[in-house]
Design a protein with these regions (language model features):
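Charge-rich, solvent-exposed alpha-helical interaction surfaces
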Residues: 11, 18-21, 73, 93, ...
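Short, solvent-exposed segments of well-ordered alpha helices
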Residues: 2, 6, 33-41, 113-120, ...
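Amphipathic, Lys/Arg-enriched alpha-helical patches that create a basic surface
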Residues: 116, 120-128, 139-163
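Short, hydrophobic, well-ordered secondary-structure elements
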Residues: 38-59
Length: 163
């Protein structure tokens, strides 16, 4: 199911294009560590886009009742409690809207399913970079592209649940 939100869709297309360009560039480089650094950068970028996209979907849902005070409260609560998205944090925020929303999400994405494993990998890579630095990068652009393609259904499902 394609993403209906134009802003999110455009960001996902940008990432896909960036991955294509990076793979072409990396193929011309003699030092594989350059590709690993680039892959790690793209991984962190993907996580940022995921955070922003998921928050945007929650904000859009928060404004549906047309009550700015309620929406502002919800948006601040989401911003405060939601970064480095994980299965449980997404489920908890969905549950605040409606327990059925989190149940639908948890039913679709079991703890060890491919999509959640990809999301966890993206988070782990970013955390390792932030806390251990770039001294031991072994990430490939193909790995990042694989993770990216596997997390898109998470955004699609959140958009579907909140619609």
């Amino acid at each position: 199911m394609p993403i209906r939100n134009a802003e999110i869709s455009a960001k996902l297309v940008d990432i896909a294009d960036l991955l294509k360009d990076a793979k072409v560039w990396a193929a011309t480089q003699p030092d594989p560590s350059l590709a690993a650094h680039l892959a790690t950068y793209i991984d962190v970028y993907i996580l940022g886009v995921l955070e922003e996209s998921i928050e945007l979907l929650f904000r859009e849902r928060a404004y549906l009742p047309k009550d700015d005070c309620v929406a502002n409260y919800i948006c601040k609560d989401i911003k405060r409690s939601f970064s480095n998205p994980k299965r449980t944090s997404i489920g908890e925020v969905l549950k605040k809207f409606n327990p059925d929303f989190s149940n639908a999400f948890y039913t679709k994405f079991a703890p060890n399913c491919s999509e959640i494993e990809a999301l966890d990998s993206i988070n782990t890579i970013k955390q390792n970079l932030a806390h251990m630095g770039a001294y031991d990068l072994k990430l490939s652009l193909q790995d990042v592209e694989d993770y990216f393609n596997r997390v898109i259904p998470i955004i699609e499902e959140i958009e579907s649940i909140l619609s």
